[in-house]
Swiss-Prot record:
Provenance organism: Ovis aries
Function: May act in concert with kisspeptin, through opposing affects, to regulate the activity of gonadotropin-releasing hormone (GnRH) neurons across the seasons, leading to an annual change in fertility and the cyclical seasonal transition from non-breeding to breeding season.
Keywords: Amidation, Cleavage on pair of basic residues, Neuropeptide, Secreted, Signal
Single Gene Ontology BP annotation: negative regulation of gonadotropin secretion
Protein name: Pro-FMRFamide-related neuropeptide VF
């Protein structure tokens, strides 16, 4: 098994090295062996016959007259500045004297990081309200957690916790005494003594 994998590894290394060396030597065109000489290459690269794209189309005087009004009609549309180009920097051909849009400048401090509290309160919605919960839910969870902490020390809660955690282990090992159960009973007894 090791000999076969070693042979494959050697073959792989030889193949990659030969490919890499062939690419290195073939980068220079003077070293590439070619079937055609440069003379033949020039002969085949020249276009043959009369090609359609070489013909130049001549415009008549009437066609030039027709194009004149069309160009004049389209120039105002070309010269109009779109609203997205209103804030382009000066290097794109805008002059300093041109009046800039004040609507975009009104939000500039928010973009630069000033006024963060206002921008965050506007842009990020209150998640409990978004999912249909209100601030009263916080108070309800606090009262429930307080009740849970108070009831944790009662014996009925300890029995419930024990039944939730230890019952699967008793089912798996019915013949053995459960050491975990004994540990919980000792802890429960100690807590009851401390409460009294």
């Amino acid at each position: 098994m090791e000999i076969i994998s070693l042979k494959r590894f050697i073959l792989l290394m030889l193949a990659t090295s030969s490919l890499l060396t062939s690419n290195i030597f073939c980068t220079d065109e003077s070293r590439i062996p070619s079937l055609y000489s440069k003379k033949n290459y020039d002969k085949y690269s020249e276009p043959r016959g009369d090609l359609g794209w070489e013909k130049e189309r001549s415009l008549t005087f009437e066609e030039v007259k027709d194009w004149g009004p069309k160009i004049k009609m389209n120039t105002p549309a070309v010269n109009k500045m779109p609203p997205s180009a209103a804030n382009l920097p000066l290097r794109f051909g805008r002059n300093m004297e041109e009046e800039r849009s004040t609507r975009v400048m009104a939000h500039l401090p928010l973009r630069l990081g000033k006024n963060r509290e206002d921008s965050l309160s506007r842009r990020v919605p209150n998640l409990p309200q978004r999912f249909g919960r209100t601030i009263a839910a916080k108070s309800i969870t606090k009262t429930l957690s307080n009740l849970l902490q108070q009831s944790m020390h009662s014996p009925s809660t300890n029995g419930l916790l024990y039944s939730m955690t230890c019952r699967p282990q008793e089912i798996q090992n019915p013949g053995q005494k459960n050491l975990r159960r004994l540990g919980f009973q000792k802890i429960d007894d100690a807590e009851l003594k401390q409460e009294k």
